[in-house]
Amino acid sequence: MIRKRQSGSNKSVSSGNNQEVTRVRTPRKDRNEVLATVASLLGSKRVTLQCMDGVVRMGRIPGSKNKKMWVREGDVVIANPWEIQDSKADVIWKYTKPQVDWLERKGYLN
């Protein structure tokens, strides 16, 4: 819904509730990316991830994404497992609610 401000300016304000899914980023197998759900927040930019491949990993939010991506419990993210240590991963993408609905409809989420 778009409405005009009453202060006389001609800038419009949108409510943001009617988001449309135009393009959804899916995990790329060639980059070793997996879908994961945030199980718990550990603090200090660290989270516990329940990955779709059945492994529970400790996820790290890189500094470049820290301020831009606010992660909460239950969020669906893309994780990139470390090559050296498979029990750890980097969180590289967070999905919005309409994108999660699209992933469930297409069968990416179980």
Swiss-Prot record:
Please name the InterPro entries in this protein's record: NA-bd_OB-fold, RNA-binding_domain_S1_IF1, TIF_eIF-1A, TIF_eIF-1A_CS
Keyword Protein biosynthesis assigned to the entry: answer is yes
What are the cysteine partners in each disulfide bond?
none
SMART domains xrefs: eIF1a
A GO molecular-function descriptor: translation initiation factor activity
Q: Which Gene Ontology cellular component terms are annotated?
A: cytoplasm
One GO BP annotation is:
translational initiation
Q: Identify the stretch(es) annotated as Disordered.
A: 1-29
Per its UniProt entry, which superkingdom is the organism in? Archaea
Name residues in a coiled coil: none
Identify the keywords attached in UniProt to this record, alphabetized: Initiation factor, Protein biosynthesis
Q: Which residues form the S1-like domain?
A: 22-96
Biased composition (Low complexity) is annotated at: 7-18
What does the protein in this record do? Seems to be required for maximal rate of protein biosynthesis. Enhances ribosome dissociation into subunits and stabilizes the binding of the initiator Met-tRNA(I) to 40 S ribosomal subunits.
Q: Which family does it belong to?
A: Belongs to the eIF-1A family.
- Please name the NCBIfam families in this protein's record: eIF-1A, PRK04012.1-3, PRK04012.1-5
Q: What is this protein called?
A: Translation initiation factor 1A 3
